[in-house]
Structures are given as C-alpha cells and as structure tokens.
Amino acid sequence: MALITAAAMAMGLAGCGGGSAATATTAAPAETEKTTEAAVTEAAEAAKSEGSDNWKVAILTGTVSQGEEEFRAAYGPEHIVTATYPDNFMSEMETTVSQIVSFASDPDVKAIVMCQAVPGAKAGFDKVREMGRDDILLIAGTPQEDPAVISAASDLVLYADEAAQGDTIMEKCAEWGIDVFVHYSFPRHMAMELIVARHELLKKNAEALGIEMVDVTAPDPTAEAGLSASQQFILEDVPQQLKKYEGKKVAFFTTNCGMQPSLQTACLDEPNAYYPQPCCPSPYHAFPATLGLELAIGGDDTEALEQIAAKLKDRFSTWASPVAMTIIEVGVDYAKGYITGEIADRNDAETLKEMFNSKVEGAKINNYKNADGEEFDNYYTILLAPVDFNDYLK
C-alpha cells in the first residue's frame, strides 16, 4: 500500500518529536459512566466472540494528514476511521484525550494507531483501559512522552532511532568536511529523552571529529507566537550564522518538523550551508514544497529521490524512505493482522521486523534501551542510512 507525500505525517507543529487529563466533554454521573462503559465493553466482546468482520482501525494524526483515502481504499471504508489532534496540542491535551476516548466508545474499533503520539497519548490510552477496552490494540508512533511512560501505556511504540542519528548525521558531516554544526531546538524538545540522547551523541562525535557544535534556541512553534515565528527565526538566523562563520562549511539541523521548509530554503542558495537530514528523515519531508516539485500521491520513493537529486546534490541528504509514514502503514497492517487473528501476540517482534523490512529496505529495527541500560521490549526504533543524492542523478 503506497503512502503519500510530505504532509501525510502531520508533523508541522509536533516535531520529532503525561499525567492524566480530563476529557473535553462534561463528565457524566459516575453510575451512568459505568453503565456506558460496561455496554461498550459487552458489545466489543460480543463482536469478538462472533468473529464479526465489522472491525475498525482508528488512526489519529495531526491536522495536515492526507493519508485517509489510501487506507480506506486498501482496507475498505468500513474498516478505517480517522481523526486529528489539535495544532495546539500542548494546551489542548483534553481534546486529544477526548478524541481517543471517542474512538474507544465504538465497540467495533479494535485498534488505535496514533502518530505522532503527542502529549495526551498516555492519558488517552489509560482512559481506554479504564473503559474496559482491553481488546483494543494501542500503537504509539513517534511519541513525545518519556519512553517508560508511553511504553507502559501502549502495546507497541514505533519511532525513528533518534539517538543513533547522532552517529549517522555526524558521519555525513565528516564526509562533507563540515567545520561547524548548528543545532536548532527549544526547551520542550530538549526535555525529551531520545532527542537529548541524540544531542549528546552529536556533541560527542562533533568533538571527536573536530567539528564545532553550536546550540541555538529557536521559538517553540506551539508557543503563542506560533509556527510562523519559528520559521521566520530560522530564515533570519541561518544567514547570520553563515556570516559569523564566513568561509567555513556550516551544517544546519533542527529538531522540529515545521521548521524544515524554512531551513531548507535558507540553505538552498548558500554554497557553504549544508543540510544533513530533516528531523523525521524522508524524501517527502518539506523537499517537494521547498523545490516546487509535484510528486504523485503514492508515488515511488526512488522517483521522488531522483527528482530531488536533479535540484540538490552534495550539500543535502535525507533517508531513502519516509520512515514516519511507514510507521503508520506498518502500524495499521499489524493491527489488521492482530484483529483478524493472523498475528497472535500484541507484541510479536519478529513479525513487526519482517513488516518493516518488507516495506523499507535496509531498515535496522531495535528495542530502545535508555541511558541506564533498561530495555523496553515493546518500544522499537527504526534506523536507515542517509542517502547521497548523487546516486540518484539520471
């Protein structure tokens, strides 16, 4: 099943990148709430025991997701329901939780795939279990809550390997002969465990390679000034950094998806500006808009890379496949297999790895291990090697 272009992952504000929360609706009296939850649970169990084909997979993404039609085409409109979480998800967590609860209130919903799993995912998943919906498979993609927290609340967690990118990004910088590496982020992202792990590895590798690493704090796109302020900051700061390090090769990286178009644009016509990858590596992550490309919905990844290569080479890179989009695709495929009985376990590592490798050639799938050495057996990270666009020149 082909997935679509850049916007399909709804990354603009979230950016690669909780306690309990109330739902957005007015709470019902306790007895009524218990009765409703019992009815939903009973209906769900009845459907399961009857082997009903009325199952549904619910997909929750950000507001610019455009993948709905292809999922409906692949599985049938009766099997897929979609919704979005709000752009201002940090201040509207109740809305996110409410949407998850709404999915779980449908007894035919047997799996929820959320990507990005922004703050509110854990609280929403906990609420699903409190409703008695233990039959629902919960899959969190690209989570923004602490690994231990979201791992405990989910059946499966899927994420691009942020930490290991501290190696692959610096390897690309070394290949280019980079002198300075500029890292744009903001406090909210720098409080996220995997982003911090990547940052520390970037810093360690930069020091070993003799590359000067510069940390720059950018405006958070979820703050009051919004995404436009963050994008404008990037457009203004990149030329300043290049002027400061005049004559040196400067690589730029930002942890936020919504800043990628501005960063690509700012680097595009500057001969000493380098762009090792987007935060969520993909041929579609901002490149089509930045370069004015019309890539076909559901198009071939190699064709996309060839079109990008015709306009970019030597100073830009990304991953060969849209790993973030693939997380949703694999999540839905896995959910369908579990619901229909083709997959017996909620967490079947071998089947999951086979699914990823069948869709993303060369993917390295590992269980996440934190700084203390604790491994999470349901938290999977995905890593690909950066591409050389020269390899895609016709």
Predicted region positions:
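Short, well-structured alpha-helical segments in soluble
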Residues: M93-K110, K127, A229-K248
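Bacterial lipoprotein signal-peptidase II cleavage site
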Residues: L13-A27
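An alpha-beta-alpha
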Residues: S65-A74, V157, D161-D215, A335, ...
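Extracytoplasmic "Venus flytrap"
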Residues: S49-S98, F103, V113-P119, I195
